[in-house]
């Protein structure tokens, strides 16, 4: 029997409000997870509205069965980085009224030791979002060069002791390969020089490996760039990020498309022509969870919501 793991959607009300739901609109939940945001969107859609969900986790696809009887809902098994292609396959480019992304690992993924995401629960060192394909964390750690590991830990985990930890992993794996999350977490805790308060020494390395194994930042970049091309005029984009790497990407993306393309000085272009290169405008300021939400769900603490709107020129 499959064990169920609870998931509380972060910034639920604020994220869906950011979409400015039209009852007859077409919306995309780019990170279905366990369906919390999708459920709220469906509550606000009318009988002719439509919601398309995307997720690459087979367990999320199974969870979507809860909406099997709702004709307004459909789900695609795949990565959100291919969002624009899925929209084109459906013939809906330029007709999407809103897209939401909730980046990061869901509570069910973290809480299920068999998925291998958590350094607090012993399980196979997997970390794949889609555990039906691709290289596992254990397989990568077994073959990666010290320089490659150090680069991943530094770039994706912002780990200050990246090279030292990479050397220690390489030395230990020559004796016994790392196959379990606890083995890796214990090694990092033993050799790490980190003194961050209230943060496990393995936090940054586990984050880095997960991001690398799943090509998360590349997927996010593709998803955001694809989203802006498929939105209808006045279509909304609600994006939740969970760590500084993600949030910087989202912030820069919105800023870049809000400013438009830089035009060489002296070109005979009108202001209206220059404005046509501006594709988005930011809606309000970044939103963080309330103290009450953090009390209910400690994992919401680091989340940030940013909302943007597709311009119509």
From Swiss-Prot:
| Highest taxon of source | Bacteria
* Segments forming a coiled coil: none
EC assignment: the record states 2.1.1.199
Query: Where does the protein end up?
Result: Cytoplasm
Q: Top EC class per UniProt?
A: transferase
Q: Which SUPFAM superfamilies does the record cross-reference, listed alphabetically?
A: Putative methyltransferase TM0872, insert domain (SSF81799), S-adenosyl-L-methionine-dependent methyltransferases (SSF53335)
User: What reaction does this enzyme carry out catalytically?
Assistant: cytidine(1402) in 16S rRNA + S-adenosyl-L-methionine = N(4)-methylcytidine(1402) in 16S rRNA + S-adenosyl-L-homocysteine + H(+)
Which UniProt key words apply to this protein?
Cytoplasm, Methyltransferase, rRNA processing, S-adenosyl-L-methionine, Transferase
Q: Return one Gene Ontology term, BP aspect.
A: rRNA base methylation
Matching entries from HAMAP family are given as: 16SrRNA_methyltr_H
- Its biological purpose: Specifically methylates the N4 position of cytidine in position 1402 (C1402) of 16S rRNA.
Protein name as annotated: Ribosomal RNA small subunit methyltransferase H
Please name the source species: Shewanella loihica (strain ATCC BAA-1088 / PV-4)
Task: Name the encoding gene, please.
Answer: rsmH
